[in-house]
């Protein structure tokens, strides 16, 4: 047992070190955004090229090549971002100039809408399998909540590493898989599969666990990649995340789960603005090693979720179970996981339960439902633990779990 | 007319420094305009260019196309300019002006104004010409275009248009309405684009709307086109 602990600790440390190393490395690429004109009549509209998706794409590619040549860059990749009205071009820095200096210079070029370094993000799993089993479903009374709501048909985009859709608990639970990391095939990985299990694992199938929202439609968008075999530590970057967010917006998902963290990123902030403006609930995992909780959890409008025992000072952070969470792993395997990644996944599932009950739930109403209040009705000045039963009761206006407990949480005198 | 076209081209090149320019060359088996053949059911070649000032929403462009009017060869010159505004990521509107004339057939020159919207892949526009093909009466044209991505680089598209003319139509003993439809599939092999479509018209004949098409042109046609964009 002691031997296993040492190996697990070493693997965990190695994985985290790789992730941290990747994030602290100087970015070697920049993202250059060029404006895309709104669709409009074209010369040959009635004749031949009306229906091509973006006839002016060639013009932007030509400008991108000119920019790359002028600034000593190498054009690597591109991706349309209609949610922002831009095309995003990835350019590699071949000189010794820093990415931020080149991005700043490009930002002043009138052909360029905006530019920024391609930054690195990482997931927030602690990947420690040695804690004792302690089903979190019991704390949120999942089975009782499922009598009222299962998140049916609520679309959740899980922006993460790859999900194993053939895992017995996830078989038939994944609505769509997309790979935004590279051109190779979709790949099943640890962190993505672990997060997916917590959200949508099949209920009543005789194996494994129960997801918080087992009838939600999960879009498994692979924007992160596992750094080493056997470790959930994964990395992502501005470009892969932006592509996945853009796709989630195109698919009109109701919830986006971001169990990852990294530096503030202008492109991702703008995509989150577009999501929030479209009434999409964005759930972000808090990185308790940084003062502000890390991006995107620190971004206004994002539901920031930390583990119940996390040392966070912000009052707008929600706390959910983050230790000893049983969940799915690639293959027919299950394991215990720890980290705010999984607390965020639970909250994404809970939001799906609430949105099934009230599809027109506004962000304010959602905050009200999740936000436990003091006995006098004042909002708390500290991070508060989510009471899932109280939240469901508030949105459904029905008795759920233990009615007495629920009413106490709502500030209603217990009879 | 050549001087006008050259002047427009020079002006556009002069201000293109910060514009996004797209060009395309197209070969078609039949040049169908709102269902009417402007090439006498014969093949045609087209050269088009578009300028976008994406930050402001302004755009302009033009096209030169071979044509065959009244059984004689001609060159069509078309220019347009407009403004488009994106309201939401998947919804935008536009308005603009378009002017067309034909070499050796100046009597067919006309201008029209248009306004439209784009919602995802669905595009709708309403055109108004005070003197359609310079025939002395106004005409309205409404159209809807849609496209749908198929597997891989294939896509399907459809078009429906409805044309209504003003003025007296007694001499034609016909209605003042006409509709045209087009359905097809395309293959996007950037920078090449290949399309095969079937087009048809219903309602009044070409003569009622002053189209300069030769007598005997068909109402239905298969059209194959290949374009190269840069």
What kind of feature is each model-predicted range?
Chain B
Residues 19-68:
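Short glycine/proline- and aromatic-enriched beta-strand/turn motifs that initiate or cap beta-hairpins
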Residues 21-25, 58-62, 79, 93-95, ...:
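Transmembrane beta-strands of outer-membrane beta-barrel proteins
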Residues 25-29, 47-51, 81-83, 97, ...:
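Residues on the lipid-exposed face of transmembrane beta-strands in outer-membrane beta-barrel proteins
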Residues 26-30, 63-67, 84, 98-102, ...:
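Outer-membrane beta-barrel pore domains and translocons
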Residues 41-45, 73-77, 91, 107-113, ...:
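Residues that define the transmembrane beta-barrel architecture of outer-membrane proteins
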Residues 110-173, 198:
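Detector for outer-membrane/organellar transmembrane beta-barrel domains
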Residues 120, 183-193, 198-200, 216-230:
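Outer-membrane beta-barrel "beta-signal"
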């Amino acid at each position: 047992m002691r031997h296993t602990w040492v190996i697990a600790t070493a693997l965990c440390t190695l994985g985290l070190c790789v992730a941290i190393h990747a994030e602290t490395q100087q970015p070697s690429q920049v993202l250059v955004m060029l404006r895309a004109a709104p669709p409009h009549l074209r010369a040959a509209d009635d004749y031949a090229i009306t229906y091509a998706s973006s006839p002016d794409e060639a013009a932007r590619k030509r400008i991108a090549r000119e920019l790359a040549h002028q600034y000593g860059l190498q054009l690597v990749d591109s991706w349309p971002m209609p949610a922002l009205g831009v095309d995003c071009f990835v350019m590699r820095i071949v000189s010794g100039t820093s990415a931020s200096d080149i991005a700043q210079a490009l930002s002043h070029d009138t052909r360029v809408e905006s530019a920024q370094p391609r930054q690195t993000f990482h997931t927030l799993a602690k990947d420690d399998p040695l804690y004792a089993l302690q089903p979190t479903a019991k704390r949120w009374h999942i089975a009782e909540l499922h009598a009222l709501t299962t998140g049916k048909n609520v679309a959740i985009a899980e922006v993460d590493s790859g999900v194993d859709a053939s895992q017995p608990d996830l078989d038939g639970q994944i609505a769509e898989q997309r790979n935004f990391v590279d051109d190779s095939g979709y790949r099943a990985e640890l962190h993505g599969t672990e997060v997916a299990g917590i959200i949508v694992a099949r209920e009543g199938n005789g194996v494994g666990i129960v997801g918080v929202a087992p009838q939600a439609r999960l879009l498994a968008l692979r924007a992160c990649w596992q750094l080493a075999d056997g470790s959930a530590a994964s990395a992502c970057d501005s470009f892969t995340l932006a592509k996945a967010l853009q796709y989630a917006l195109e698919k009109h998902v109701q919830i986006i789960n971001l169990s990852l963290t990294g530096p503030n990123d202008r492109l991702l902030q703008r995509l989150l603005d577009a999501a929030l403006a479209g009434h999409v609930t964005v759930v972000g995992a808090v990185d308790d090693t940084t003062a502000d909780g890390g991006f995107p959890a620190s971004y206004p409008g994002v539901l920031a979720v930390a583990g119940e025992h996390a040392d966070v000072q912000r009052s707008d952070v929600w706390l959910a179970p983050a230790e000893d969470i049983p969940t799915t792993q690639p293959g027919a395997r299950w394991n215990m996981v720890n980290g705010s990644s999984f607390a965020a996944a639970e909250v994404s599932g809970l939001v799906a339960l609430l949105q099934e009950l009230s599809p027109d739930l506004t962000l304010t109403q959602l905050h009200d439902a999740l936000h436990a209040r003091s006995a006098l009705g004042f909002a708390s000045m500290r991070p508060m633990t989510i009471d899932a039963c109280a939240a469901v009761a508030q949105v459904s206006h029905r008795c759920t779990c233990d009615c007495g407990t629920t009413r106490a949480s709502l500030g209603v005198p217990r009879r | 007319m050549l001087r006008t076209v050259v002047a427009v081209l020079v002006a556009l090149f002069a201000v293109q420094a910060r514009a996004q320019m797209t060009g395309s060359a197209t070969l078609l088996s039949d040049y169908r305009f709102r269902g009417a053949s402007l090439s006498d059911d014969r093949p045609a070649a087209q050269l088009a260019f578009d300028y976008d000032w994406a930050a402001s929403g302004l755009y302009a462009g033009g096209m030169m196309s071979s044509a065959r009017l009244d059984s004689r060869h001609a060159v069509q010159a078309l220019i347009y300019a407009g403004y488009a505004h994106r309201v939401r990521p998947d919804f935008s509107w536009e308005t603009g002006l378009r002017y067309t004339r034909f070499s050796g057939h100046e009597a067919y020159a006309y201008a029209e104004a248009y306004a439209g919207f784009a919602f995802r892949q669905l595009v709708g526009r309403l055109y108004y010409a005070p003197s359609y093909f310079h025939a002395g009466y106004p005409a309205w044209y409404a159209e809807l275009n849609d496209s749908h991505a198929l597997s891989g680089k294939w896509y399907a598209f459809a078009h429906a248009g409805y044309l209504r003319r003003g003025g007296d139509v007694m001499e034609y003993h016909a209605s003042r309405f006409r509709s045209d439809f087009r359905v097809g599939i395309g293959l996007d092999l950037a920078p090449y684009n290949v399309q095969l479509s079937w087009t048809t018209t219903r309602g009044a004949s070409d003569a009622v709307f002053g189209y300069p098409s030769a007598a005997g042109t068909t109402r239905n046609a298969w059209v194959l086109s290949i374009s190269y964009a840069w």
